[in-house]
Structures are given as structure tokens and as C-alpha cells.
């Protein structure tokens, strides 16, 4: 019986037959015990199909014993098949525009929310739907990319009188930036340390005001954040102020007030609009003179998704004045849809190997396909938008591979840094080091070089806290190899234990932003600044370098009126073989149309930005600064050259200079060398004429 009990039961059989004829009629087959038949039903003979082979007892024991042996691996036949995750699959999404109804069709929900908050009217959408789609794709992609910091451009600023400066700029950051920690207005980087970059004071009499005060919604959000940051800023009340520009990722969620407003932000709207008066309680710090959305941005090129340029993670951006990372808000006023909720939409298809090389699990981003590609098809009255694809999520194995590659990359970068930095102890070369600022990416000191008595700025960065160290190398090399009187001077660098020390020229005059927001410049002074910047640009372009982030934040001034270009964290090195770029880099309000529309571009993007900066010197702010960033991008793409307020008050030479800079057709736009010969520059006054403006800006902010 034991042998009978060990036999497996017979497999189930059909109780009815599908066969025709009289052989099988009505009945079925009963299954009994372990044998066949076991009692037939009617006249139907038992099913004669053979049972499965009975397993051999010896084989069963061998398998059991083998499974208990430690370290033994099951044979290929015994193990479950390893089914991999799908790769290179695509989820296509088509967005169209119905010209009859004036509505977009098939638009992702996140895009719809973004567009709803963009202040782009229905008429404007109907006028140029392709421009709307272009900026939506770009904007969405920017918010999802995990940007990396331009580490040597941190606006580390402590404030005199709890003042806040315009948050300068530039690149993306995965940690709270120094600009955020201290609200610096500095545009310079280590590349240029500035003194006295602070915001407008309530007693400033010669402020160049332009633009409008933003709505109540902006003010309420700003007030809330200011209340959060007040305790930290109060601690810095009496500290000395120096800025080193922070490169920032631009996340378009800045809570802002008009850059030209010289009033403090306080607890209510009336205080925002009227003069400030002493309060019994400590007054809240003033808002930044420029909104956070004046930060720079960096996205991947259309044709290149190499891991080296895939930015690092970043939390949603905060206002310029937000002191701590936990004070950040997940969504912005200007563009609430720029929050992480957009990360669920379809994105570019990433190659598996590139995906594995990332340092993080890629989140979906919008596909960046040119309008002329195969996915841009026009059907009927609809404008088709490029398809989008979803990259597969990274598996644990992928993440492990990512971490391994990241570690190897860090080792290579550190080895490269060792070949760049100087050997020795900087503490012996520099004395009287005084801490003047601290932020997420490092601490800034002023020091005296013992041998020369020259004052320098030293930034100390903990390399373990820098997620994209290769950008540090890029910036150091560009600065070291491109020395010019109009470029902030890189002096030296050292590796001290786990820290990188970078020594830069110290410019105490502050950034040009302080001057344009605090004072009124005449054409002679504007021409002088333009000439100096053009000399720097002509030098860089001749050496195949595009700056890509020209704006007043990145122009530093000496007390003698010297003008120097800084912030090379996002510069591009071009070559005859690769003379064009498509990476979205810069700050939206200063961006050239070809950058906004994702066309290939070259050095002339810097000349467009110079033209916008010239308008900034006239009006106190760039065009469209009071617009939602998404709408500003739309207006740049649609209108091209912006309108200039009171243009008739400008000289004909200045008007022509602006026309040459702001020519939409790149081939017709003047080069830096051409503009250096322009008659407008003959109006330039001596650089010493800038000194009174610098001192006036300092005086205006002194009481803040």
C-alpha cells in the first residue's frame, strides 16, 4: 500500500467529449484511487492516455540533499527563468492644437496646469501655439532635471543690517545654495568676490525704478517665507557682506516682487507699497531686489543625453530670501505646476547604458524632438507635438551599478584635481583669514597674501558634499587658461584634507546688479560697461569659449570702476568640429530666441544677452521680469526683440547698438569684434565715473 500511496493521483480528464460519433456517448470517465477507470460511466471506455512518469525516489532524495548543501547553485533547469525588465520601450503622447476651438488636445495634465498658471492668454496661445508648446516642453524638462551646481559661484553673503540681495544666479543646485541661505545678490563667483551686494534701502533716493509691484498672491507668499527666515537673518545683522555668485538651477518657482521696487517686504501689503517706518518689533528683512527666477538654468542638449551632462537632483527652488532648505516650498507662485507633480509625465527615451550611468533613478522628462521630426505631423487643423517616451525605472541592480560608476568617477575627478591644484599648505601663504559667509557648498573667507599684501577671497568646499565635481574642474580650467583684464582672476587652488580651497581675486565693488537697481546710469557709463564686457567676450569667443550667462549679476566691479566678467560654471568650449550647441543654458529673461526655441547656437548668444543687460542698465531690470517665467519665454520666442521703454529718449547711436545686439536673425547679429567698433562705445566715459554709482549703491543699502 505504501507504494500505492506514493503514486501521484491521475490527472483530471474531461467528463464530456468533443468527439462526434457513436463511440463516445453521454458518459464520462471516473477516476479512482490511482488507477485507470475506477468505474466507468455508461458504455464509455476509460481514457487510455498515459499518466506522467512517476518520479524516482533516489532522484528526489538527491535533489533534497543537494538543496541543503551550502553554496550549491541550482542547475539551469531547476532555477526560475530570470526575466529582465523591459528596455527601450516608449510611451508616445501626441499633443495637438485645434485652430477652430483654440484649445490644445491630448495635453498632459501637468502641462495643462502649467499653462493655466502661465498667464498666456487664449489669444496668445492661438496666435503662436508652437511657441507655447516649445516653452512648455523646455519648462517641463527644466523642472524635472536634477541640476548640478556651479560650485565656485556660490553667493555666500552675510548681511549688514539684515539686508538681502538679489539672488544671483546661475546654475542648478541639489542643496540649499548660498544665495538661498543668505539671499545674496552677488553675481560673481569665486571668480570674483564682491563687497556690499545688498538690496535697495527704504531711504534710497536715486533708485532706478521700473516695472510693477506684483499681486497680492505673490506678496502673501513672500511674507510667509520672510517670517520663516527672519530669525536666521537677524543673526547675521551685523556681519560683513561679501558675495560669490551661486550657480543655481533655475526651477521657475520663485516668489517675487518687482526687481525695481525699493521697498522692504513686511507683514502687510500696505508696507509693501509704502515707505518703511521703524517698528517696535525687529523689522523683517527686505525682499530680494530681483526675483529668484533670475537664476540661471542648464538642461541637456537635444542630441546628447550623455550622463556627464545629466544634472543632479534638486528640490524645488525657493525664494531668494529663504534661508534654509526645509523652508523651501514645493510649488511656486509664478509656476505652481513646476513642482514635482509634473514628474509623472512621459519623457525622453533613454538608452539603457546611459540610464545605468545616471546617479539617480531618472524621472520622466518631456521629449525634446524638433518640430520637423517624424513625430511632428500635421493632421487637419491640428499641430502635432513631438512624441514623448517613458524611460524604465531603475532596478536595484541598476542603482548598484550607478553607485559603482559614481564612485569610480569621483576617484577619477579627485585624481584630476590633484594634477590641477598647487602643492603646499595655504595657511602659510595666506594670513588674517576672516570668515565672511557660509552656505551649503562651502565657506568663504577674505585673506591677505603674505608675500604681496593683496587681499583675496578663498572659498573652502567640502568635496564629499559636492555631487558634480567635474564642473569644478571645468570652471577652474577655463579660468586658469583664459586670463584677461576684464575677467575675474583665478589665483590658486589647494586640496586640504577633504576640502578644496579656491583662491580668487577679490572685487569689493559688488555686482553691476546693485548699481542698476540702486542708481540711474547715463549713456556714457553704460557704454563704458558695455565696452569692458565686449572686450572680455571678444577674448573668450576668440578662444572658442561661450559664456552663456551674461547678465548684471555676473559683472563684478572694483571700487576704481573696473569691470570684470565672472561665473564660468556653464561656459561652453567649442571647436571647429563642434561650433554649435543646443544645451539650454542661461537665465530666461536674458536668453536669446535661438536658445529658447532649442535651435543650435553659437557665441552670438552672449551678444543678445549683452543687449538685454544694456536694457537692464537703462530700465533697472530686463524685459518681462514681471511676467511669469513661462510667459516670458513665450514672449521671447514670439516677439523676438523686446520693446524698449521710452526708446525715443535714447541716442541714435545707443538705439542702433541695441538693434545690433538684439537682432533675431543670428547671421545678421553683430559679433563682439563688430560691436567693439560701434560708434556708441565712443560715448564711453572713464571707468572712474562708475565709482560714485558704486558708492551710492553701497550708501543706499548701508542702513538695511
UniProtKB/Swiss-Prot annotation:
Record field: compositional bias (Basic residues): 61-73
Principal cellular location given in the protein's record: cytoplasm
Function: Protein kinase involved in intracellular signaling pathways downstream of integrins and receptor-type kinases that plays an important role in cytoskeleton dynamics, in cell adhesion, migration, proliferation, apoptosis, mitosis, and in vesicle-mediated transport processes. May be required for the formation of dendritic spines and excitatory synapses. During muscle embryogenesis, promotes proper muscle morphogenesis, as well as guidance and targeting of subsets of myotubes.
Gene Ontology cellular component terms for the protein in this record: cell leading edge; cytoplasm; cytoskeleton; cytosol; focal adhesion; growth cone; lateral plasma membrane; muscle cell postsynaptic specialization
Bias kind Basic and acidic residues: ranges: 50-60
Subcellular location: Cytoplasm; Cell junction, Focal adhesion; Cell projection, Axon; Cell projection, Growth cone
Keyword ATP-binding in annotation: yes
Subunit structure: Interacts with activated, GTP-bound Cdc42 and Rac1. Forms a complex with pix and Git; the interaction with Git may be mediated by pix. Interacts (via N-terminal PXXP motif) with dock/dreadlocks (via SH3 domain 2).
Residue segments, region Autoregulatory region: 80-171
Sequence segments annotated as region (Linker): 97-429
Gene name of the encoded protein: Pak
Gene disruption: observed consequences: Homozygous knockout flies show defective wing morphology. Mutant embryos show guidance phenotypes in ventral oblique muscle 5 (VO5), ventral oblique muscle 6 (VO6) and ventral acute muscle 3 (VA3). The affected muscles bypass their normal ventral attachment sites and mistarget toward or crossing the ventral midline. Mutant embryos exhibit additional muscle phenotypes, such as increase in lateral transverse (LT) muscles and VA3 numbers and defective lateral oblique muscle 1 (LO1) and ventral oblique muscle 1 (VO1) shape.
Recorded consequence of changing residue 459 to A: Fails to rescue mutant phenotype, probably due to disruption of kinase activity
Keywords recorded for this protein, A-Z: ATP-binding, Cell junction, Cell projection, Cytoplasm, Developmental protein, Kinase, Nucleotide-binding, Serine/threonine-protein kinase, Transferase
SMART domains: PBD (SM00285), S_TKc (SM00220)
Record: active site: 549
Record-listed E.C. numbers: 2.7.11.1
Chain span(s) of sequence motif PXXP motif (SH3-binding): 9-12
Low complexity bias (residue ranges): 159-178, 255-266
Binding site for ATP: 436-444, 459
GO biological process: autophagic cell death; axon guidance; cell adhesion; cell migration; cellular response to starvation; dorsal closure; dorsal closure, spreading of leading edge cells; imaginal disc-derived leg morphogenesis
Residue numbers spanned by region Disordered: 1-87, 159-188, 254-292
Family: Belongs to the protein kinase superfamily. STE Ser/Thr protein kinase family. STE20 subfamily.
Domain Protein kinase residue range list: 430-681
Name the UniProt record assigns to this protein: Serine/threonine-protein kinase Pak
Catalytic reactions of this protein: L-seryl-[protein] + ATP = O-phospho-L-seryl-[protein] + ADP + H(+); L-threonyl-[protein] + ATP = O-phospho-L-threonyl-[protein] + ADP + H(+)
Amino acid at each position: 500500500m505504501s507504494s500505492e500511496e506514493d503514486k501521484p493521483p491521475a490527472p483530471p480528464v474531461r467528463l464530456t467529449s468533443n468527439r462526434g460519433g457513436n463511440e463516445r456517448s453521454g458518459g464520462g470517465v471516473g477516476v479512482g484511487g490511482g488507477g485507470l477507470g475506477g468505474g466507468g460511466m455508461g458504455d464509455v471506455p476509460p481514457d487510455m492516455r498515459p499518466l506522467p512518469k512517476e518520479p524516482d525516489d533516489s532522484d528526489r532524495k538527491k535533489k533534497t540533499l543537494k538543496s541543503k548543501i551550502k553554496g550549491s547553485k541550482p542547475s539551469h533547469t531547476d532555477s526560475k527563468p530570470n526575466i529582465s525588465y523591459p528596455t527601450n520601450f516608449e510611451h508616445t503622447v501626441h499633443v495637438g492644437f485645434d485652430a477652430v476651438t483654440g484649445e490644445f488636445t491630448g495635453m498632459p495634465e501637468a502641462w495643462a496646469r502649467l499653462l493655466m498658471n502661465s498667464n498666456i492668454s487664449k489669444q496668445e496661445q492661438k496666435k503662436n501655439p508652437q511657441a507655447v508648446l516649445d516653452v512648455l516642453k523646455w519648462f517641463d524638462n527644466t523642472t524635472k532635471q536634477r541640476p548640478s551646481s556651479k560650485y565656485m559661484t556660490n553667493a555666500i553673503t552675510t548681511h549688514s543690517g539684515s539686508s538681502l540681495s538679489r539672488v544671483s544666479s546661475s546654475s542648478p543646485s541639489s542643496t540649499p545654495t548660498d544665495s538661498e541661505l543668505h539671499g545674496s545678490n552677488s553675481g560673481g563667483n569665486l571668480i570674483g568676490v564682491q563687497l556690499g551686494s545688498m538690496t535697495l534701502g527704504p531711504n534710497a533716493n536715486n533708485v532706478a525704478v521700473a516695472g510693477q509691484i506684483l499681486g497680492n498672491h505673490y506678496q502673501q507668499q513672500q511674507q510667509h517665507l520672510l517670517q520663516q527666515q527672519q530669525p536666521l537673518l537677524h543673526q547675521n545683522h551685523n556681519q560683513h557682506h561679501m558675495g560669490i555668485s551661486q550657480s543655481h538651477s533655475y526651477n521657475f518657482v520663485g516668489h517675487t516682487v518687482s526687481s525695481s521696487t525699493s521697498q522692504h517686504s513686511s507683514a502687510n501689503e500696505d508696507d509693501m507699497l509704502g515707505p518703511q517706518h521703524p517698528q517696535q518689533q525687529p523689522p523683517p528683512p527686505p525682499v530680494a531686489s530681483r526675483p529668484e527666477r533670475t537664476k540661471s538654468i542648464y538642461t541637456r542638449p537635444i542630441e546628447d543625453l550623455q550622463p556627464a551632462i545629466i544634472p543632479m537632483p534638486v528640490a524645488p527652488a525657493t525664494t531668494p530670501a529663504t534661508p534654509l532648505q526645509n523652508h523651501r516650498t514645493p510649488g511656486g507662485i509664478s509656476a505652481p505646476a513646476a513642482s514635482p507633480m509634473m514628474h509623472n509625465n512621459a519623457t525622453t527615451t533613454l538608452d539603457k547604458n546611459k540610464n545605468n550611468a545616471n546617479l539617480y533613478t531618472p524621472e520622466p522628462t518631456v521629449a525634446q524632438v524638433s518640430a520637423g521630426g517624424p513625430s511632428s505631423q500635421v493632421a487637419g487643423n491640428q499641430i502635432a507635438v513631438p512624441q514623448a517616451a517613458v524611460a524604465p525605472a531603475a532596478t536595484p541592480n541598476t542603482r548598484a551599478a550607478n553607485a559603482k560608476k559614481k564612485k569610480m568617477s569621483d576617484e577619477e575627478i579627485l585624481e584630476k584635481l590633484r594634477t590641477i591644484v598647487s602643492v603646499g599648505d595655504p595657511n602659510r601663504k595666506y594670513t588674517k583669514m576672516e570668515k565672511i559667509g557660509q552656505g551649503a557648498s562651502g565657506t568663504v573667507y577674505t585673506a591677505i597674501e603674505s608675500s604681496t599684501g593683496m587681499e583675496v577671497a578663498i572659498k573652502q568646499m567640502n568635496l564629499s558634499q559636492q555631487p558634480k565635481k567635474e564642473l569644478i574642474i571645468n570652471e577652474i580650467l577655463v579660468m586658469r587658461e583664459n586670463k584677461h583684464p576684464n575677467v575675474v582672476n583665478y589665483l590658486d587652488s589647494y586640496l586640504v584634507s577633504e576640502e578644496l580651497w579656491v583662491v580668487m581675486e577679490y572685487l569689493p565693488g559688488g555686482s553691476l546688479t546693485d548699481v542698476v537697481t540702486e542708481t540711474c546710469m547715463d549713456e556714457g557709463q553704460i557704454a563704458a560697461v558695455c565696452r569692458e564686457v565686449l572686450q572680455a567676450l571678444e577674448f573668450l569667443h576668440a578662444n572658442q569659449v561661450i559664456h552663456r550667462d551674461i547678465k548684471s549679476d555676473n559683472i563684478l566691479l572694483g571700487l576704481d570702476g573696473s569691470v570684470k566678467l565672472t561665473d564660468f560654471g556653464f561656459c561652453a568650449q567649442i571647436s571647429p568640429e563642434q561650433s554649435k550647441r543646443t544645451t539650454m543654458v542661461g537665465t530666461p529673461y536674458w536668453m536669446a530666441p535661438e536658445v529658447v526655441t532649442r535651435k543650435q547656437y553659437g557665441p552670438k548668444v552672449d551678444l543678445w544677452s549683452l543687449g538685454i543687460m544694456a536694457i537692464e542698465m537703462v530700465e533697472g531690470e530686463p524685459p518681462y521680469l514681471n511676467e511669469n517665467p513661462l510667459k516670458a519665454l513665450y514672449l521671447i520666442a514670439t516677439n523676438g526683440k523686446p520693446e524698449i521703454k521710452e526708446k525715443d529718449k535714447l541716442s541714435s547711436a545707443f538705439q542702433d547698438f541695441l538693434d545690433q545686439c538684439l537682432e533675431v536673425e543670428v547671421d545678421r547679429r553683430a559679433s563682439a569684434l563688430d560691436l567693439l567698433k560701434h560708434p556708441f562705445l565712443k560715448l564711453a566715459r572713464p571707468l572712474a565715473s562708475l565709482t560714485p554709482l558704486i558708492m551710492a549703491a553701497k550708501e543706499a543699502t548701508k542702513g538695511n
